[in-house]
Each structure stands twice: as structure tokens, then as C-alpha cells.
From Swiss-Prot:
Positions of disulphide bridges: 96-178
Keyword Transmembrane included in the entry's annotation: yes
Intervals, Cytoplasmic compartment: 49-53, 120-141, 222-239, 291-320
Protein name in UniProt: Olfactory receptor 51E2
Record note on disruption phenotype: Knockout mice display reduced baseline blood pressure.
Pfam families in the cross-refs: 7tm_4 (PF13853)
Purpose: Olfactory receptor. The activity of this receptor is probably mediated by G-proteins which induce elevation of intracellular Ca(2+), cAMP and activation of phosphorylation of the protein kinases PKA and MAPK3/MAPK1. Activation of OR51E2 may affect melanocyte proliferation, differentiation, and melanogenesis and may increase proliferation and migration of primary retinal pigment epithelial (RPE) cells. Activated by the short chain fatty acids (SCFA), acetate and propionate. In response to SCFA, may positively regulate renin secretion and increase blood pressure.
CDD domains on file: 7tmA_OR51-like
Residue stretches spanning the membrane: 28-48, 54-74, 99-119, 142-162, 201-221, 240-260, 270-290
Keywords: Cell membrane, Disulfide bond, Endosome, G-protein coupled receptor, Glycoprotein, Membrane, Olfaction, Receptor, Sensory transduction, Transducer, Transmembrane, Transmembrane helix
Amino acid sequence: MSSCNFTHATFLLIGIPGLEEAHFWFGFPLLSMYAVALFGNCIVVFIVRTERSLHAPMYLFLCMLAAIDLALSTSTMPKILALFWFDSREITFDACLAQMFFIHTLSAIESTILLAMAFDRYVAICHPLRHAAVLNNTVTVQIGMVALVRGSLFFFPLPLLIKRLAFCHSNVLSHSYCVHQDVMKLAYTDTLPNVVYGLTAILLVMGVDVMFISLSYFLIIRTVLQLPSKSERAKAFGTCVSHISVVLAFYVPLIGLSVVHRFGNSLDPIVHVLMGDVYLLLPPVINPIIYGAKTKQIRTRVLAMFKISCDKDIEAGGNT
């Protein structure tokens, strides 16, 4: 390994290249989205935990999804806001590796949970009489543990692969946070093992999940089209709309970001960074909105909470 290795030094985050002077203003919409993500996902976790009628597999998966979104957005947004508002550009090597690990691992866990939710829809629609036996709450928790272990095992090697590299030419990351592809590009030594393993891990996790989610919905559509009445078909499809929306919100930006990272060298770096920032916030922001709008129990509890809060404010105002 080259003697110019500075693995125990710091990296410098650029943020949005070429738009450094506008960082202060970019921080406000990002903070707003982060606040919505925190509020929405905390509400989902609270309602699912406290509402006994929601202690069913699909909603337990939704609770897991909300917890993952909270962790994923919190792993990056505080540092991004510190960078944009206080010019806090430095991030230590170990902190960068930790952030990289959490981003990739949590994304893999979320992908697995989305696959589990697709399986839940498949069993509920294609084998409704077996749903309670196949997917009970114990099995749901076990699937959550498998998702955690699977994501951790596949992406734990990434920081180790980065640690073996030597960095000489630059410690400047043209991004707002640390991801494997960008840190790897700064290395002075051969990065082929990193490239091969990174691509393999993504294909074995995200690729496999997308394939089985697609298969699940192929079987669901085939079953639904065989239902005798139009109302039955509409009702069956209606139970899948929320999950399909969440899947698209997660995978479409992820696939677009992966394509840009690997084949978009001619694109302006601004595009890379903005897509990366939006990708980390889009699912956490819209997931609770989608499920809150489509799930009567969640919608009713949220409205009831606001009503109670407003009534207390009115009473307090009347007593003064």
C-alpha cells in the first residue's frame, strides 16, 4: 500500500458543486422535508404501536418501514444542514465510513421490507384463506430480523474494502454525504474489488428484491383479472395501490441514481448531488403521507390527535 495513505484524516464535503453560495437557501426546503419525514414517520410508528387493530402483518411492516426511514434520513440530514448553514465541511474518515454503512445498509433493509410487503399482498389476494397461517405477527417480526441481518451482512464489507485503499490526490468529496461510489473514486490504489463487490451486493439485494416484487404483482394481477365482478377487481387492486406507490417512490429514484453514478459521467455534478439528496428524503417524506391517506385507522387517529390538541388550545384560551 502506498505511504501516502491518509485513512485517519478527514474528508471535505463540497455540498452542491458550483452552488456553494446558495447552500444557505437550499437548507430551508431540505429542513422542511426532514421535519415532515420526522413528524410523519413518528406518527406512523406511534399509531401502529398503540392501535391494537393495526397489529397485523401489513401494518407491522409499515411500522418497520417508518422506523427505517427515520434512521435513514437522520443518518445524513443533520450533517447536510450543518454543511449548508454553518460550512461544516469536515467529516472524519471513520464518521464517513459509518455514514456510508448506514446509508447502504438501511436502504437494503428497506428494500427487503418492501419485498415482504409485496409477499403479504400476494398471500392476501392469491391465497386469502391461508394468510393468517402463513403471515402471523411472529413470522412478521422474524422477517424484520432477517431484513436487518441481510442488509448488515451484505454491506458490512464496504467500509472494510474502503479501509484497504490508499488516498493521495484529494480528500474532497463532491457530495453532501458519504457513499461508497464517491469515496472509492478518491482512492489512489486499485478499486476493482470495491467495484465488483459493490455491484454484486446491489444486484443480490435490490436486483433480487425487484425481481420478486415484480413476480408477486404479476401473480396478483393474474388472480385479480380472474375475479368475476368489476367491483371485486377494483377492491383487490385498491389494497395494493399504497404499496405500489411506495415501491415506485423507493426504486425509481434509486435506479436513476445508480444509472447516473455509473454511466452519467458527462452530466453536471450538480445533478448527481441533487438527485442523491432528494433520494434520501423522498421516500421518508411521502411514505407516511401515502399510507396515512389510504389507511382509515391511521387517518382517523391523526385527525383525532389534531382535534384533541385544538380543543385543549381552545379551552386554555377560554380560561385565560
